[in-house]
Swiss-Prot record:
Source domain of life: Bacteria
Record's protein name: Bifunctional protein GlmU
Ligand binding (UDP-N-acetyl-alpha-D-glucosamine): 9-12, 23, 75, 80-81, 142, 157, 172, 230, 353, 371, 386, 397
Main location: cytoplasm
Length: 476
């Protein structure tokens, strides 16, 4: 919307976090805390967003570097919320619409709440609308003081409040909708004659009333939406609420979560209908999970894409991978930055290291490790094997104990194996070496030279049987 802008207050250090990371950059369900109100402002229709930053401004600048609709205004000294808004005024010079003011450490506000507040603001003709909440324990919040007609006449901060004012339970949520023309004129006139010596944004309410302008309150239905985060205890509580919200959205879209409270799904994850997720699962980093999948207990999936009808068994770890449809990842398998095509089966207890590209119907069995390999359709390595820096064709059988010897102490070398090759057990390929198609590599062979197609390669010490040797040895 061209007539709606947003200011995100994100300049504070967050001393109570006891951290070297500025408060608003602490992660909450997969995204920095400050990213939540930014996303909600966008969804509410804000066409221009100004984030007021201070401590570790460069960290925030880097995070928002690809967001064309976000401008950063620097508040060199944190002199209060009124001063912060004044710092943003220059970036909205000439703007004449409505301005949402949000807090970077109040991440759980809903889009629907902001839209409703903007609608109410327009309907009442107010110059300022304050989002308020009823709190059983209002300690630390500014109290809402209403006039006889229900309008907001002022907000009193906790440290400046009288005992009677502190007894009130309607509090300021720190979120506002204001007319730009009024807002930017008013913040220039704010003083700092208060217990904190700060420039309170709430002082503009008194200014509006003194001019006969309307200030209204818009109550939020759920106080959780406006909970602020000041320490790691509150961060954990907010994360619990965020995960519940995320879980409910997925369940309403046809996903089965066996135990939602024990399932950890980050913001932005996409999961198809009829997928079932068991307890203890973590899905993070912008994952996409297809329809009809089963994710068993304790699995971890990060930054990956899974096709339809995949099965990820217990305690599997998948990071940065792309899986086709009908893939089975068995228990205890670890996969990193790899691609697995349709109908493949991996594990149990396999390790796919970065650069593994496995074709359709491939089988990688227990205690097999791969790295930087391309493996063709229908090939299999069923157990106890290392395949690194290799290109393996279609329908290849790799026997137990096979190793590609890819490192000579200085450089890595590749092994190339053609289609329809049978590799017996306990074979070593000393790279660089090329194996032609339709060959058989006998068990126990150490391959040091290329093998032509349609051949048998065998390289082992001849067997010698010394009859009676054991008896003679015993009698000595």
């Amino acid at each position: 919307m061209d007539n709606l802008a947003a200011i995100i207050l994100a300049a504070g250090k967050g001393t109570r976090m006891k951290s070297g990371i500025v408060k608003v950059m602490h992660p909450l369900a997969g995204a920095p805390m400050v990213a939540w109100p930014v996303a909600v402002a966008r969804q509410a229709g804000a066409g221009r967003i100004v984030a007021v930053v201070g401590h570790q401004a460069e960290r925030l600048r880097e995070h928002f570097s690809n967001d064309a609709d976000i401008t950063l205004a620097v508040q060199e000294e944190q002199l209060g919320t009124g001063h912060a808004v004044a710092c943003a005024a220059g970036d909205l010079s000439g703007f004449s619409g409505k301005v949402l003011i949000l807090c970077g450490d109040v991440p759980l506000i809903r889009t629907e709440t902001l839209r409703a507040m903007v609608t109410a603001h327009e309907a009442t003709g107010a110059v300022l609308t304050v989002l308020t909440a009823r709190q059983e324990n209002p300690h630390g919040y500014g109290r809402i003081i209403r006039g006889f007609d229900g309008r907001v006449i002022r907000i009193v901060e906790e440290k400046d409040a009288t005992p009677d004012e502190r007894s009130r339970t309607e509090v300021n949520a720190g979120i506002y909708c204001a007319e730009a023309s009024f807002l930017f004129d008013a913040v220039k006139r704010i003083g700092n004659d208060n217990a904190q010596g700060e420039y309170y944004l709430t002082d503009i309410i008194t200014m509006a009333n003194d001019r006969g302008l309307r200030c209204t309150a818009h109550p939020v239905a759920d106080p959780v939406e406006v909970m602020g985060i000041n320490d790691r205890v509150q961060l954990a509580e907010a994360a619990r609420h965020a995960r519940r919200r995320i879980a409910e959205e997925h369940m309403l879209n046809g996903v089965t979560l066996v135990d939602p409270a024990a399932t950890y799904i980050d913001q932005g994850v996409v999961i198809g209908a009829d997928t079932t997720i068991q307890p203890g699962v973590q899905i993070a980093g912008g994952c996409r999970v297809g329809e009809g999948c089963t994710i068993e207990a304790g699995a971890i999936i990060k930054g990956s894409e899974l096709g339809d009808r995949c099965v990820v068994e217990s305690r599997a770890v998948i990071r940065g991978c792309r899986l086709g449809s009908d893939v089975v990842i068995k228990a205890g398998t670890v996969m990193e930055d790899s691609t697995v095509m349709d109908h493949a089966a991996i594990g149990p207890m396999a390790h796919l290291r970065p650069g593994s590209e496995l074709g359709a119907h491939v089988k990688i069995g227990n205690f097999v490790e791969t790295k930087k390999i391309v493996m063709g359709e229908g090939s299999k390595a069923s157990h106890l094997t290392y395949l690194g820096d290799a290109t393996i064709g279609r329908n290849v059988n790799v026997g137990c104990g096979t190793i590609t010897c890819n490192y000579d102490g200085v450089n890595k070398h590749r092994t190339v194996i053609g289609d329809d090759v049978f590799v017996g057990s306990d074979v070593q390929f000393v790279a660089p070496v090329t194996i032609g198609s339709n060959t058989l590599i006998a068990a126990g062979t150490t391959v040091t030279r290329d093998v032509p197609a349609d051949s048998l390669a065998i390289a082992r010490t001849p067997q010698i049987n010394k009859e009676g040797w054991k008896l003679r040895k015993r009698d000595q």
